[in-house]
Regions:
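A general structural signal for short secondary-structure junctions and capping/turn motifs
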Residues: 66-68, 90-96, 116-118, 166, ...
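A translation/RNA-centric and nucleic-acid-associated enzymatic feature enriched
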Residues: 107, 178-333
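N-terminal pre-domains immediately preceding structured catalytic cores
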Residues: 48-54, 168-176, 318
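Class II aminoacyl-tRNA synthetase-like tRNA-binding/catalytic domains
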Residues: 1-117, 125-129
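Generic recognition of stable, solvent-exposed alpha-helical segments in well-folded globular domains
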Residues: 16-19, 23, 27, 135-142, ...
Length: 333
């Protein structure tokens, strides 16, 4: 449900908003590629469901699918490129320590639109090859800190061009496990835990998402066939405009063969082992990797002090969202 903060007014005009979005995307991409040694590649919009390349997200979302009568196959619009990227690193013969980045545009038909969520998803999807010995928390934390520095550096340049922006971000990252959050706030929901913790620690990375906690429930659901649930997490910043924690990136070290089999068993999805992608992983053909997605619209919202994702991207909205934004003077693109 959309809720516009009382008294909210955009710091930028529609024209300046569009110019600032362009600057955010260009500057951040340059900084991120330098920080993580990434090269841009072209990504697919649709994939063949029989390959197992699409992201199953939480396992309940239905990808947009349609038939291709002149090709003789079915197609799915990507929900993310988590598995495709790992395959692409192998196919394009990337070296250890190097990675790729691409613009991911997705349609998530089951998404519940609100201030932060849209049917249309745009993010930077990145993936980098690591060694087996680098499958550890040090590697994960190093990548997180590099991403945070790229974000804060982008904000510094943005505020030089638009001094009316008051966004403040902390470069100091607090790392906390999802179990530690549950122990701190056992009676709160995962979202409430995030808000309570990130309010006090404005740049936070929550480690370990997907596996069941001591309560028997995971902090959040993750597909079992790309992230290692013990070596992944979410990067959140405190958003003063919305007065809540905002997830900017979901990322992690990817599953190896044993972790894949274990997580698929836990999730009751062992049938996926028959798919081409999963067979390649089990057979040791795919490289060890770390990767993630960074929300383009989310980042623009955060840096430009926007109250609704529709102020920085064009999509289709429900009637309630359109009415509330109109009443508050919020211009949806």
């Amino acid at each position: 449900m959309t809720k516009i903060p009382e008294g909210y007014r955009s710091s930028l005009s529609l024209y300046d908003t569009q110019k600032a979005i362009e600057q955010v995307k260009n500057v951040f991409l340059t900084k991120l590629c330098a920080a993580l040694k990434l090269s841009r590649v072209t990504a697919p919009l649709i994939v063949d469901p029989l390959t197992g390349m699409n992201d199953n997200l939480n396992g309940v979302e239905h990808p947009v699918a349609f038939d291709l009568p002149n090709v003789g196959k079915d197609a799915e619009v990507v929900q993310s490129l988590a598995k495709w990227k790992r395959y692409a690193l192998w196919r394009y013969n990337f070296a250890v320590g190097r990675g790729l980045i691409c613009d991911m545009n997705a349609i998530r038909r089951d998404e519940q639109p609100d201030n932060l969520h849209s049917i249309y998803v745009d993010q930077w999807d990145w993936e980098r090859i690591i060694t087996q010995d680098e499958r550890n928390t040090d590697t994960l934390e190093d990548a997180v800190c590099r991403i945070v520095e790229a974000i804060c550096g982008t904000l510094d340049e943005l505020k030089w061009h638009y001094p009316q922006l008051n966004t403040q971000l902390s470069r100091e990252v607090t790392f906390v496990t999802s179990q530690e959050l549950e122990d701190l706030y056992p009676t709160q929901t995962p979202k409430q835990r995030e808000d309570l913790f990130v309010r006090e620690h404005p740049t936070t990375f929550i480690v370990g998402i997907g596996a069941a906690l001591n309560s028997g429930q995971p902090h959040d659901f993750r597909s079992p066939d790309y992230d290692d649930w013990s070596l992944n997490g979410d990067l959140l910043f405190w958003d003063e405009t919305l007065d809540c924690a905002v997830e900017i990136s979901s990322m992690g070290i990817r599953v190896d063969a044993e972790t894949l089999k274990s997580q698929l068993t836990i999730a009751g999805c062992k049938d996926r082992l028959k798919l081409p992608f999963h067979k390649m992983l089990i057979n040791g053909e795919l490289p060890f990797t770390i990767g993630g997605g960074i929300g383009q619209s989310r980042l623009c919202m955060l840096l430009l002090e926007k109250a609704h994702v529709g102020e920085v991207q064009a999509s289709i909205w429900d009637k309630q969202t359109e009415e509330r934004c109109a009443e508050a003077g919020v211009s949806l693109l």
